From Swiss-Prot:
Superkingdom of source: Bacteria
Name of the gene encoding the protein in the UniProt record: grpE
Localisation per UniProt entry: Cytoplasm
Cystine connections: none
Residue numbers spanned by region Disordered: 1-21
Protein role: Participates actively in the response to hyperosmotic and heat shock by preventing the aggregation of stress-denatured proteins, in association with DnaK and GrpE. It is the nucleotide exchange factor for DnaK and may function as a thermosensor. Unfolded proteins bind initially to DnaJ; upon interaction with the DnaJ-bound protein, DnaK hydrolyzes its bound ATP, resulting in the formation of a stable complex. GrpE releases ADP from DnaK; ATP binding to DnaK triggers the release of the substrate protein, thus completing the reaction cycle.
Protein name, per record: Protein GrpE
Bias-annotated ranges (Basic and acidic residues): 1-10
Subunit structure: Homodimer.
Lineage, broadest ranks: Bacteria, Pseudomonadati, Pseudomonadota, Betaproteobacteria, Nitrosomonadales
Length: 157
């Protein structure tokens, strides 16, 4: 017991150091908690901003698609008008119908060109599944796996 009380000043200093260290640790913990809260708020902000960007991009894509479809549709109306005009002609000859259909086909091709839809003619080419769609396989005098008949020859570029 005597040894415990021999250096009371040392005990006071040790307790003071411990109290100072605890206060310093409490301050450091409070500082780190504040930084953590700030970073969590930043994460939430960045996440919300990312969602806003995705939403705006989706809206822009929808608007562009709608505008393109409206423009394409309005261009096709002129083709439909030409076809309707051919239906109301009385006493038309086969030659006049043929001429009208040719002009209407040119009008339609013009619309296709305007919207980058091109006409292709793969007859005789080797079948490419990336460009062509096969309906069936038929025996032919042509090279094996080549296109021998075309049902649709217009496609987007």
């Amino acid at each position: 017991m005597q040894e415990e009380n021999q250096h009371p000043e040392q005990d006071d200093i040790s307790e003071a150091q411990d109290a100072g260290a605890a206060g310093s640790l409490d301050a450091r913990i409070a500082e780190l908690e504040a930084q953590l809260a700030e970073q969590q708020a930043n994460v939430l902000y960045v996440k919300a901003e990312g969602e806003n960007i995705r939403r705006r991009a989706a809206e822009d894509i929808d608007k562009a698609r709608k505008f393109a479809l409206e423009k394409f549709s309005s261009e096709l109306l002129a083709v439909k008008d030409s076809l309707d005009a051919a239906l109301v002609v009385e006493n038309a000859t086969v030659e006049s119908y043929k001429s009208g259909v040719e002009l209407t086909a040119k009008q339609l091709l013009s619309v296709f060109e305007k919207f980058h839809i091109t006409e292709i003619n793969p007859l005789g080419e080797k079948f490419d599944p990336n460009k062509h769609q096969a309906i069936s396989m038929l025996e032919s005098d042509q090279e094996p796996n080549s296109v021998i008949s075309v049902l649709q020859n217009v496609r987007p570029e």
